[in-house]
């Protein structure tokens, strides 16, 4: 039997690993890069020492060659018979059915389809933007994944003679434009913080007339959590720019919760200066609502939740809240679950506790709230998935504050409780939001920094510009801001370029 080893190395054409290699492991980029490349060197040396056959591919092959053909050629030269898997088999391998990775991927695709329709853009228009920006990653994803799905979705709606909610808004707008709409004296809009471009266009058509009907809108920009469904916070925060002379009445009394949660939550949400400033105070100053952070070790996670639930009086209501619908995954191994219609419960001790996503909990309340998995992770809180750079081309640009949407969502989560909110986090990987409350001294600009050019390929002109700034004596921080990349990326690239010149 002939034994052959096939290794895929996750490095680009310059031998550099992706930035998330460091983020997911809680180490610096330099450490992640060095550690991974040391592993590559060791593996190659080991195969050479023991005269074993090693075939290799790298991430660079996906960009500069046909990885499938390269792999096929390598295997054929090594006299390996090839039995290719079907597309369905490959999909199940990459995204196992019902796994959190498959759910996150589906959510990303659905989000793009929703946004492309609500923003009134075409896929071709978005592709032109990605190509003009030199964003190869986003161009590839949109062209090869999102566009075919979007096309098939539109075809399926036509085949079954149905429309979705966005279609209903768009068609209603067209009907109003082409006919003589009813004249209104007043138009009242609730949850106005969630208004999107398509709904704004519909509202604008409804108000056509001389004089236009009076518009009365109610909303809370602190709870604007549907940006990924197309909502545009600028339509709320800059209301008068879109609708003319405006009178603003602030509702600054909360009837649900008291101090210290009122002050803590207000300070947290208003760190983002794009949010409207408000001075929230409780209706009853005697009401107290606590905010408590609870760390855990992974092996004790379910027990910690059980202990918290057991400590809550039996006559008090309790919510379990997750950033994702799969945040209750580990609970399912220890506690019995019960589904009642669209509601989901866990039997913990002698109690039936409802589990909800934070989005579903908006507008609801309980005496006690336990927020799960507030960890520094791709699927943590704040979520890193929802901010995938590919969505920047269809998202509104009204709020550029780092994790602005996630911050509002976290605010919604912690303010569902009337008595106490518990925030659970892995003691090894507390999220940046947890650190902001417990260890504000650890928070720096880099903690929240986003880098618009992080996914762009380094070009010769970019390299020359980098070297020019560096030799002019500019600081690494200045260069990083100027080039839209992280300071770590700049340091690594300089090391690569300076090494070539020696």
Residues covered by each model-derived region:
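Conserved helicase NTPase motor core
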Residues: 135-235, 253, 363
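Active-site beta-strand-loop-beta-strand hairpin of nuclease catalytic cores
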Residues: 1-15
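Conserved helicase C-terminal RecA-like lobe
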Residues: 313-317, 352, 360-427, 431-436
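Short alpha-helical "recognition helix" segments of helix-turn-helix
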Residues: 479-481
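A basic/glycine-biased coupling hinge at the interface between accessory DNA-binding modules
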Residues: 12, 16-39, 44-51, 57-162
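Conserved RecA-like helicase ATPase core segment
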Residues: 39-40, 44, 197-291
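Helicase P-loop NTPase motor core
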Residues: 245-247, 253-348, 361, 402
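Short, amphipathic alpha-helical "recognition" segments used to contact nucleic acids or chromatin
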Residues: 458-474
């Amino acid at each position: 039997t002939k034994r052959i080893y096939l290794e895929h190395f996750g490095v680009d054409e310059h031998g550099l690993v992706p930035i998330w290699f460091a983020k997911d492991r809680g180490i610096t980029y330099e450490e992640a890069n060095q550690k991974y490349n040391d592993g590559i060197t060791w593996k190659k040396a080991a195969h050479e020492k023991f005269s074993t056959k090693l075939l290799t591919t790298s991430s660079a092959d996906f960009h500069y060659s046909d990885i499938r053909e390269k792999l096929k050629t390598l295997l054929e030269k090594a006299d390996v018979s090839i039995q290719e898997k079907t597309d369905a088999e490959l999909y199940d391998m990459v995204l196992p059915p019902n796994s959190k990775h498959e759910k996150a991927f589906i959510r990303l695709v659905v989000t793009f389809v929703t946004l492309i329709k609500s923003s009134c853009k075409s896929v071709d228009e978005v592709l032109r933007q990605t190509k003009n920006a030199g964003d190869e990653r986003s161009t590839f994803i949109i062209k090869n994944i999102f566009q075919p799905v979007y096309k098939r979705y539109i075809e399926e709606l036509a085949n079954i003679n149905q429309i979705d909610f966005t279609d209903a808004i768009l068609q209603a707008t067209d009907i109003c434009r082409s006919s003589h709409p009813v004249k209104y004296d007043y138009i009242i809009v609730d949850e106005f913080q969630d208004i999107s471009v398509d709904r704004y266009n519909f509202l604008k058509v409804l108000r056509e007339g001389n004089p236009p009907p009076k518009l009365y809108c109610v909303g809370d920009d602190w709870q604007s959590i549907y940006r990924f469904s197309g909502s545009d916070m600028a339509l709320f925060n800059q209301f008068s720019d879109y609708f003319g002379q405006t009178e603003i009445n602030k509702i600054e009394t909360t009837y649900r919760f008291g101090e210290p949660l009122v002050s803590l939550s207000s300070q947290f949400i208003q760190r983002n200066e794009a949010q409207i400033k408000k001075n929230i105070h409780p209706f009853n100053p005697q009401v107290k609502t606590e905010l408590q952070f609870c760390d855990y070790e992974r092996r004790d996670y379910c027990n910690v939740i059980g202990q918290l639930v057991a400590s809550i009086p039996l006559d008090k209501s309790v919510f379990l809240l997750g950033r994702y619908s799969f945040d209750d995954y580990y609970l399912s191994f220890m506690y019995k679950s019960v589904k009642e219609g669209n509601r989901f419960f866990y039997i913990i001790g002698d109690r039936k506790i409802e589990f909800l996503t934070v989005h579903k909990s908006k507008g609801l309340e309980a005496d006690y709230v336990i927020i799960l998995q507030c960890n520094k992770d791709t699927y943590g809180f704040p979520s890193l998935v929802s901010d995938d750079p590919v969505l920047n081309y269809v998202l509104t640009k009204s709020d550029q504050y780092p994790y602005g949407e996630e911050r509002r969502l976290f605010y919604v989560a912690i303010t569902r409780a009337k008595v106490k909110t518990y925030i659970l986090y892995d003691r090894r990987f507390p999220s940046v939001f947890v650190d902001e409350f417990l260890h504000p001294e650890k928070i720096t600009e880099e903690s929240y920094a986003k880098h618009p050019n992080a996914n762009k390929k380094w070009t010769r002109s970019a390299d020359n510009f980098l070297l020019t700034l560096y030799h002019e004596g500019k600081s690494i921080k200045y260069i990083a801001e100027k080039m839209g990349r992280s300071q770590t990326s700049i340091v690594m690239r300089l090391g690569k370029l300076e090494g070539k010149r020696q």
